[in-house]
């Protein structure tokens, strides 16, 4: 696979060429088996901590793809969650944003968007570490207590160019599949990364990396898959 193979075709992001027979390595087979089991989990997680060995494995998965995964300590997680809530509050004040959420989230869906079954409950204490896709609209979500000390990680890349963005996507895939293979649930938090103040999410100890994704990780109950378009509609 070659990223950005033709400077004259900026929308051509990658080319993939078929080669001869290939014997997959055990680690690759494990990740492949996790594809159908990987789902975003917006349910409350338990307070059980992800073991250091698994956290290191997730960080290594990002490194393989040229990215960096910072596991946040308690104070950093509190700071980043505050950024998430501030950004979401700002976004929900925008009628266009609320209209977009209404188009893509909630209700019964068979191929696009996020159905009610995948939205997760509301937090009893109004501090859920998940995005509110309903923008406060009433619905059949119910309420639940979320984990007291959410475990967060920030996926970053060294630069802000297009090749780095693509590598971030590859790294995110490998991190999520590795997490799934280890029984770890995950859900993304991107609100502050969608604002002009995305740089505030950076690790203050380094300060130069480009954050691309905030992940909430932990142990949770299994969730059903969300609908997808048929292959015939997305692949010629």
Mark where each language-model region is.
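Acidic, surface-exposed loops and disordered segments
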Residues: 1-236
């Amino acid at each position: 696979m070659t990223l950005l193979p033709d400077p004259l075709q900026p929308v051509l992001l990658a080319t993939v060429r078929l080669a001869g027979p290939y014997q997959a390595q055990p680690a690759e087979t494990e990740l492949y088996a996790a594809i159908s089991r990987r789902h975003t989990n917006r349910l409350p997680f338990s307070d059980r901590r992800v073991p250091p060995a698994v956290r290191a494995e997730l960080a290594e998965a990002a490194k393989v793809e040229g990215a960096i995964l910072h596991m946040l300590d308690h104070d950093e997680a509190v700071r980043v969650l505050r950024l998430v809530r501030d950004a979401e509050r700002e976004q929900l004040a925008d009628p266009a944003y609320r209209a977009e959420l209404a188009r893509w989230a909630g209700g019964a869906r068979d191929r696009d968007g996020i159905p009610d079954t995948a939205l997760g409950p509301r937090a009893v204490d109004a501090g859920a570490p998940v995005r509110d896709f309903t923008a406060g609209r009433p619905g059949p979500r119910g309420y639940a207590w979320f984990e007291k000390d959410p475990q967060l990680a920030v996926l970053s890349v060294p630069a802000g160019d297009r090749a780095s963005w693509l590598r971030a996507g590859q790294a995110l895939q490998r991190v999520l599949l590795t997490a799934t293979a280890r029984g770890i649930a995950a859900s993304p938090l991107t609100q502050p990364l969608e604002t002009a103040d995305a740089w505030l999410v950076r690790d203050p100890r380094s300060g130069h990396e480009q954050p691309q994704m905030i992940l909430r990780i932990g142990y949770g109950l299994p969730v059903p898959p969300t609908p997808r378009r048929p292959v015939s509609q997305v692949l010629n």
